[in-house]
């Protein structure tokens, strides 16, 4: 028996386990690449796997017997993909940290262009601080969490960046904009969360509109 993975390396890998045919099959994988693979990114197996060996137990260094692999009646690569697709991940601390940090980065990136205060975009540090006051980020749907956070930040006095539109003005359009945005000289500003309804109304009423390039607020000054 040999141990191809020492304890130091195991800190940076996750184990994916598939139980089938009354047996156990395991792969040692890099958590960040597994996350990308399972979220639809085209990732080569060589980047996902710490080694392409299929184990009975990664932690003990026990390799799966050839007879156990023959039960699949498939190629080695096909077996590996089945384990990756259908197995469950024994998440390491590194995996949990990576997923949490990735979700946080996605949310910050979404909100950076949607939130202002006093006419200025927030620095990343200020935005993270504001988010921390209203929401505990968890690993999950980044877009959904961003919408929840945005609504909470508005109640704290932050401004939601709107959609700048040139539109053929009518009584119905004017009424909608008054309730869900602002009328300016030559264009209207629609709240971003109300824009889907604005678009539907224009299409239904056959009103032409054009989304204009947004005048970017200045970035927050860092002193």
Curated annotation (Swiss-Prot):
Signal peptide: none
Pfam families the UniProt entry points to: SBDS_N
GO cellular component terms attached to this protein's record: cytoplasm
Cellular localization per UniProt: Cytoplasm
Record's keyword terms, sorted: Cytoplasm, Ribosome biogenesis
Functional summary from the UniProt entry: May be involved in the biogenesis of the 60S ribosomal subunit and translational activation of ribosomes.
Record's protein name: Ribosome maturation protein SDO1
Natural source organism: Encephalitozoon cuniculi (strain GB-M1)
Source organism phylogeny: Eukaryota, Fungi, Fungi incertae sedis, Microsporidia, Unikaryonidae
Name of the gene: SDO1
């Amino acid at each position: 028996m040999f141990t191809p993975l020492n304890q130091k390396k195991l800190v940076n890998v996750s184990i994916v386990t598939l139980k089938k045919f009354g047996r156990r099959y395991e792969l040692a994988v890099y958590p960040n690449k597994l996350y990308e693979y399972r979220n639809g990114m085209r990732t080569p197996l060589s980047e996902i796997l710490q080694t392409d060996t299929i184990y009975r137990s990664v932690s003990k260094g026990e390799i799966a017997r050839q007879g156990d692999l023959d039960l699949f009646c498939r190629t080695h690569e096909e077996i590996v993909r089945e384990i990756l697709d259908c197995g469950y991940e024994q998440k390491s601390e590194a995996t949990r940290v990576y997923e949490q940090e990735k979700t946080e980065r996605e949310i910050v990136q979404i909100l950076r262009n949607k939130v202002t205060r006093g006419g200025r975009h927030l620095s990343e540090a200020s935005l993270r601080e504001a988010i921390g006051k209203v929401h505990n980020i968890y690993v999950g749907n980044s877009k959904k969490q961003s919408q929840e956070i945005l609504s909470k930040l508005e109640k704290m006095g932050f401004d939601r960046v709107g959609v700048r539109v040139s539109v053929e003005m009518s009584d119905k359009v004017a009424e909608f904009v008054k309730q869900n945005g602002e009328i300016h000289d030559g264009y209207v500003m629609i709240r971003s969360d109300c824009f889907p309804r604005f678009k539907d109304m224009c299409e239904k009423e056959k009103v032409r509109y054009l989304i204009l390039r947004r005048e970017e607020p200045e970035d927050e000054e860092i002193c």
